[in-house]
Amino acid sequence: MLHMVILRHSPESCPGRPGNEAIHPCANAMQEFLDNAGVKTIGRWADPPAHVNYLVLEAPDGHVIQEALMESGLFAYTTAEIRPVMSMD
């Protein structure tokens, strides 16, 4: 099942801001958790001025993605929406 994950952070918690390097290991840990859970990344996009990241993931359900956000610690820096989606092609 495909899921659109929308991750938002504030300018203050932006990973590109000096002093916010602590978020980088969280993002790496999330990707590692997803890989280990067999979740396939279809695509990733960023809108830096809006402080929003978009991911399309193929996962059995949204709970796996939610667990990755929690286990990685990324939830402490972002808000997330996990939406099941389907192609309109």
Positions of PLM-derived features:
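Short N-terminal micro-motifs specific to bacterial/archaeal maturation
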Residues: 55-56, 82
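Short S/T/G/P-rich N-terminal loop/turn motif that feeds into the first structured element of a domain
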Residues: 1-51, 63, 67, 85-89
